[in-house]
Amino acid sequence: MAISKEKKNEIIAQYARHEGDTGSVEVQVAVLTWEINHLNDHIKRHKKDHATYRGLMKKIGRRRNLLAYLRKNDVNRYRELINSLGLRR
């Protein structure tokens, strides 16, 4: 199941840096984290769904790259984001 428009707007409102912000690293990572958590639950129930597993790995890689970019450019924003999302780093 894809992320609903309402849920996505809720996440965007929470992590946006300014009004109308949908593309900042924080927003992208927050949306990816929600999708990753949702796919993780799906994979736990459907262990042989290899196509979904591949999509999950692609999303994890995308999030990893965005977090590396944020860490390189603004360490304070990076730390705030991983603390608010509860990511282990």
From Swiss-Prot:
Entry superkingdom: Bacteria
Coiled coil: none
GO MF term (any one): rRNA binding
Biological process according to GO: translation
Job description of the protein: One of the primary rRNA binding proteins, it binds directly to 16S rRNA where it helps nucleate assembly of the platform of the 30S subunit by binding and bridging several RNA helices of the 16S rRNA.
NCBIfam families named among the record's database cross-references: S15_bact
Subunit structure: Part of the 30S ribosomal subunit. Forms a bridge to the 50S subunit in the 70S ribosome, contacting the 23S rRNA.
Name under which the protein is recorded: Small ribosomal subunit protein uS15
Species of the source: Streptococcus sanguinis (strain SK36)
Gene name for this UniProt entry: rpsO
